[in-house]
Amino acid sequence: MCIRDRGAKVHLTTTDPANHLNYNLAVQAGITVSRIDEAEVLEAYKNEVRSKAAETMTAEDMEYIEEDLRSPCTQEIAVFRAFAEIVDKAENEIVVIDTAPTGHTLLLLDATESYHKEVQRTHGDSPASVRKLLPRLRNQQETEVVIVTLPEATPVFEAERLQKDLQRAGINNKWWVVNACLSLTDTENSFLRAKAQNELTWIKKVEELSKGNAALIAWKNN
């Protein structure tokens, strides 16, 4: 919202099926919002493939196409292309993407690298948004990945794995955010105080991983 207040056009979107974004708040602030609905983009991609194939293929060939479209990787392709189209909007506005939890993000990252290599190898017919995706993500003047985690063992270890994969892919990450920190509250509950004390180990770990570039957000009762 601060970016929008400075006069920039902002597009907020999510790849997370859980979709925790507050759309009303964003719209009221003048921010464009969207989400990548896996079912919708899958059906749209299938229809695009069918339409293009029908121009040159026989009915028998179309049966093979339909069989191929039932492959699990078809959904990955559809989501990846939708992701690339969203990132391509950065030509005209600032795009903020809330990705799904770490495992889903890693799959998306792997798909991005794989597609980039395939496009380079085959020089095939692919959308411009796909061809430009990885170079844009690697451009530190255009892209910053902010890793968001919790002050707990598993989330921090998963986030560390994501950081390493980002580094391997040549994608910049400087800032981390640690959400729901009980250690920043004045709780008097003995159980929560013990939990808050345990958080300090993981907050310190994040500060090491981020080289001091970590923002801590206090736990709030929503």
Over which residues does each language-model region extend?
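Nucleotide-state-sensitive switch-loop elements of NTP-binding domains
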Residues: G7-V96, T102-K132
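A structural signal for isolated positions on well-ordered beta-strands in alpha/beta enzyme cores
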Residues: H11, T32, V96, E144-V146, ...
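Generic beta-strand/beta-sheet core signal
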Residues: T13-T15, A100, V148-T149, N179
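A structured binding-face within diverse protein domains that lines the active/interaction site
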Residues: L133-L137
